[in-house]
């Protein structure tokens, strides 16, 4: 499940335990919101989704491995904060849509004995002025940069261990940000998103 990671465009890292706690929380919370349990979460009186911290912890381990320990706290700005409620050990998350973020396109897969390397293209958001079509009339999605994702095995599943920029395959001339937040009434996750287990394709 690469989208909850790619959408926040993390800097290179060689061990997820060294990553910023806010990034780990955001990715894990979005993995919950896009995962198969999203329909089971309740809502508070303000229409915010209530996500148990235990589920966030589970998604963090699924995404980033068994050694990840989250520090639970409120993150985000005042209007769209992911509010942590220690009394019920849960997050109150506003139902929001993120726009202006990249989506992943797996360009290459290299399987090894206990690991897997993915060449991941970051496809920037499309606007009316930037739409391109190929000779067959299909929409062309050209990544603006490429990253090497190393996945390692944890039992039968894989988790993300490192992210490295592929400098010689970078595509210049296209920029994107890590997301502009805007409130919507419903969250419609991609049909292709699974349970949150990061499995090798």
What name fits each language-model region?
Residues 1-97:
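Core segments of small alpha/beta cavity-forming domains
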Residues 1-7, 116-118, 140, 154:
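Extended, non-catalytic scaffold segments that flank or surround catalytic motifs
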Residues 32-39, 121-126, 152-155:
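Short, flexible beta-strand-to-coil junctions
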Residues 39, 80, 89, 120, ...:
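Intrinsically disordered, low-complexity segments enriched in small/polar residues
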Residues 59-60, 64, 85-132:
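Surface-exposed, charged secondary-structure patches
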Residues 125-201:
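Low-complexity, intrinsically disordered terminal/linker segments enriched in charged
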């Amino acid at each position: 499940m690469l989208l909850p990671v790619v959408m926040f465009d993390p800097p290179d890292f060689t061990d997820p335990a060294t990553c910023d706690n806010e990034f780990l929380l955001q990715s894990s919370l979005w993995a919950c919101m896009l995962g198969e349990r999203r329909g089971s979460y309740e809502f508070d009186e303000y229409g915010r989704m209530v996500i148990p911290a235990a589920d966030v912890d589970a998604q963090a381990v699924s995404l980033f491995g068994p050694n990840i320990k989250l520090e639970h706290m409120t993150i985000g700005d005042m209007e769209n904060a992911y509010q942590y409620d220690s009394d019920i050990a849960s997050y109150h998350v506003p139902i929001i849509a993120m726009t202006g973020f990249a989506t992943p396109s797996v360009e290459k897969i290299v399987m090894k004995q206990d690991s897997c390397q993915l060449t991941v293209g970051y496809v920037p958001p499309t606007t009316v002025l930037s739409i391109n079509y190929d000779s067959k009339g299909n929409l062309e999605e050209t990544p603006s940069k490429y990253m090497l994702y190393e996945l390692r095995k944890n039992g039968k599943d894989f988790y993300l261990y490192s992210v490295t920029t592929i400098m010689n395959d970078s595509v210049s001339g296209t920029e994107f940000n890590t997301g502009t937040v805007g409130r919507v009434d419903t969250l419609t996750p991609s049909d292709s998103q699974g349970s949150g287990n990061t499995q090798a394709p």
